Structures are given as C-alpha cells and as structure tokens.
C-alpha cells in the first residue's frame, strides 16, 4: 500500500515488453489539421518557411518532400548534448545552434514540415537497443511522425544521425 508513511521508499517495478518495430500506420483521427498548427516550441516563422521551401523545391509529393526535409535535418544537425538550451524541443534553438538531442532534431523537422503544409507531430517512448534482450531502459526517446496519403510515417532523425549506417532505415 502506498501512503505518506512509506513516502520516499524505493520500489521496484518489473515489466515484460513485447518490442515491435513501428512502421507506417493508418490515421485513426482522419483530421491532421491540428498537426499543422504552431505552438510555443515549434512556431511558424519566415526562416523555417524559407528553409523548407528551398529544401522541397522540385520534389513531387509530400513523401518525397518529407524525405528531403529528413535528409536536410540529418545534414544540418549534430547529436551533441552540451551547453544551455538543448533538450527542450525548441525548434528555433535547434535551427540556430544546429545541435541537440532527439527532441531538438524532431522539433526542427516538425517546424519545417508544417511550413510546407505537411502535418507532423512528436511521438515519445523508450528506445531499447535491438541487441539487448533484458535490462534497464536508459530514459525517454522521441521521434517524429509526418502525415501523408492517410498514413502516419514515423521517422527517427537523431538515431539516423548517431548511426549513419541506419540513416536510410529511419
């Protein structure tokens, strides 16, 4: 029983996890309009619009445009966690500093995607390396999803940056 008398005590919780690869999946909501709207950390601005339009120029279809934005983000950003400001998912910070963690990579991508009318959103969970069958989870991990043709497409740009051999996998 949990109550104030045992507050502060350590507890151990175990889970059995069935890991599955997340692939493209159909939209249940059917209205991705909310994922085009700016917010405090992923705002609309002229810089995002300018960059995104340059990156997608000549690309036909949102799938090709999203891939171009992915490639641009992986080329521009570096997975480096130091200094002040990283890890907040601030797209302006990520655009200016060009470094950060998964949150920063994906906020930048989402800002660019939304600038060219591609709905995009964060997804968050845990990253468990495929080579490890048991043990602890080191913390949260996030990725982005973009919407086109009735489906959400998950992408993981920061993992693609950390492991260039997998950059085309994500």
Please tell me what each predicted stretch does.
Residues 4, 17-21, 148:
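Non-catalytic surface loops within mature trypsin-like serine protease
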Residues 5-9, 59-62, 114-117, 148-151:
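A short, structured loop/turn motif at beta-sheet edges
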Residues 9-13, 17-100:
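Secondary-structure boundary elements
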Residues 18-21, 76, 99-102, 127-130, ...:
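Solvent-exposed loop/turn segments at secondary-structure junctions
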Residues 63, 67, 99-103, 107, ...:
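Conserved structured core elements
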Residues 81-84, 102-108, 143:
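A broad, low-specificity signal for short, low-complexity segments enriched in glycine/proline
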Residues 107-170:
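Hydrophobic/aromatic-rich core segments of domains that either
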């Amino acid at each position: 029983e949990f109550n104030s008398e045992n507050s502060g005590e350590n507890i151990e919780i175990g889970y059995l996890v069935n890991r599955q690869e997340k692939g493209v999946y159909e939209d249940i909501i059917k209205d991705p309009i909310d994922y085009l709207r700016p917010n405090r950390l992923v705002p609309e601005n002229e810089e995002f619009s300018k960059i995104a339009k340059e990156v997608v120029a000549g690309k036909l279809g949102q799938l090709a445009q999203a891939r171009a934005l992915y490639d641009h983000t992986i080329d521009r950003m570096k997975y480096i966690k130091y200094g002040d400001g990283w890890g907040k998912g601030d797209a302006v910070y990520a655009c200016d500093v060009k470094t950060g963690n998964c949150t920063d990579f994906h906020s930048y991508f989402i800002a660019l995607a939304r600038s060219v009318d591609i709905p995009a959103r964060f997804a968050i969970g845990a990253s468990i390396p495929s080579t490890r069958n048991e043990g602890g989870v080191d913390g949260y991990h996030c990725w982005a999803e973009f919407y086109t043709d009735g489906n959400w497409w998950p992408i993981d740009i920061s993992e693609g940056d950390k492991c260039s051999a997998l950059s085309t996998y994500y």
